[in-house]
Amino acid sequence: MRVMAQMAMVMNLDKCIGCHTCSVTCKQAWTNRAGTEYVWFNNVETRPGLGYPRRYEDQEEWKGGWTLNKRGRLALKGGGRLRKLATIFSNPKMPSIQDYYEPWTYDYETLTSSPATDNFPVARPKSLLTGKNMTIKWSANWDDNLGGSREHASRDLMLKGIEEKVKMEFEETFMFYLPRICEHCLNPSCAASCPSGAIYKRAEDGIVLVDQDRCRGWRMCVSGCPYKKVYFNHRTGKAEKCTFCYPRLEVGLPTVCSETCVGRLRYIGLVLYDADKVLEQASIEDEKALYAAQRACFLDPDDPEVQRAAEAAGIPADWMEAARRSPVWALINRYEVALPLHPEYRTMPMVWYIPPLSPVVDVIKDTGFDAEDRGNLFAAIEALRIPVEYLANLFTAGDVPTVEGVLRKLAAMRSYMRDINLGRDPDESIPAAVGMDGETMYDMFRLLAIAKYEDRYVIPSAHAEQAHALEELATECSLEFDGGPGMYDSGPFGEGSGRPVPVAVENFQMLKDRQTSDTLAAPDDKATRVNLLNWDGKGVPSGLFPPRPDATPDRPDAGLTGGTGGRGSGA
């Protein structure tokens, strides 16, 4: 047994409202640079749909992920070393910019410099790649909310085998949202595909990163990743991908997409796994058994034998405590309601999903029946084959009974908790019907429905003694580069050349201090930083406004209109 730690995420798809807040904030934080205009580390897809890039799940075309060779051993679907060497200067399985979309801006100068005329000036779209006028034909979420579903959603590869049953008329279709980030797999095919060895998986927390210094822009990682979550920066000639916001995680903060999620659907936690089992379990022949095989790799943090092995492997005690409290471990192994995305790729992804019950509930509501009744929900899950089979194609390589079991648990939870919320005696036969007891089902409800911030994000901080092992951690002065303090080098392709902004863990430590502070304002040495999020609008918190000449120490808000003389009760 070789115990290793992995930071993982679970998303509850029933809570996703498709607002794209996670996508926008992620882009502003990580890819708001030249060369990454088309890059979305986080994107939200409407399903059924083509996804981003278009038809990325067609591995017969893109050759991503792993497959079993004639000897039953794992091999890259895109070929081994000889094939990659033969095509290293011209990768034939690269998605083109048309498979993503051509990024654009608008000619705003036409609007601002237009003289007074009888006609409204028009800002034409201009390509961010060529600078020429263009016609917008596609984008990262062009088919959002089933837009153009007759033409686009019908080409969704996950409808394979059930397409004759699916009708794309508005009255008969179904949909849900699927947020996607890098899976930070246990067996990443992108890392195995890189000829330069630039992609690596951190041993400390399992996050998969790209070493920008070693990357030579071969782009084999782009075609090797079956989820197409590795992108090529055409300004720097380097590959870039989701970083799981590692500088935030190192100080105990959740990722940007999780922090800003409106639906609070994301859970982040630590999972322990046996690294010696990964290759064996990923090589199982039956694709439908890969979900159970990956779960078999995970280790119970309450097992004394696992605890001893983890201590011998150098995993700190506070990380073991975080693993015991991990919501990800609970949703995957204790409640067994989370499923991996496309386990058939054999990469062992570590961003899991709770499949949505809403397509089934919506159908029951539309028929006028009670959508909270256990009998109605169970019958609908068995009768509505199209949504269930589609979810099985996404999350269990087509294993319908596993998806049905998860949906039955979610349906039972709805029915069981309705009785409790209405003051009725709880019906213990409801959780028993899905192999649970009432207390376990109530705990699952609390985690899925009303979990607090600290329950959804159980993130242990990095240890100082591991600082130099965390290769991307800034341990030198973050201002020491060409141009002086705060300046970036110009680079061969213009200012900054689209390079990522250097990060310093000190900045995220200050951010954590402000977000977890009990006071409205930061300490005296940073008095201008006021936490407006926790201000209820009553009174004037210290540091919000400059002091008035007539203010006294006991009345700092004297003379300010609307003040109540106190700093407010907070929120």
Enumerate the predicted regions with their spans:
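Non-ligating segments of multi-cofactor redox enzymes
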Residues: 1-571
